């Protein structure tokens, strides 16, 4: 088993499927557009709370957006 798992995501794909801009999604979950951009590019790992808010806003299950590598 790997010791250093990295949380990856398909946030951009899920966001585009919902026809949302980064700014639109950011407003739905109460963060900045820069935060959404940083999550999408893997520069920022969201908290559990933010990850769940993103899933709710995008009507997706956690495992549909986030995965470990």
Annotate the PLM regions.
Residues 9, 19-20, 46-49:
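Residue-level signal for the short linker/turn that defines the boundary of a DNA-recognition helix
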Residues 49-64:
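DNA major-groove recognition helix of helix-turn-helix/homeodomain DNA-binding modules
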Residues 19-38:
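Short alpha-helical DNA-recognition segment
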Residues 1-17:
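A short, Lys/Arg-rich alpha-helix, primarily the initiator
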Residues 1, 66-69:
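Short, charged recognition helix plus adjacent turn
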Residues 16, 27, 56:
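Alpha-helical residues within the helix-turn-helix
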Residues 41:
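Short, conserved catalytic or interaction motifs in soluble domains
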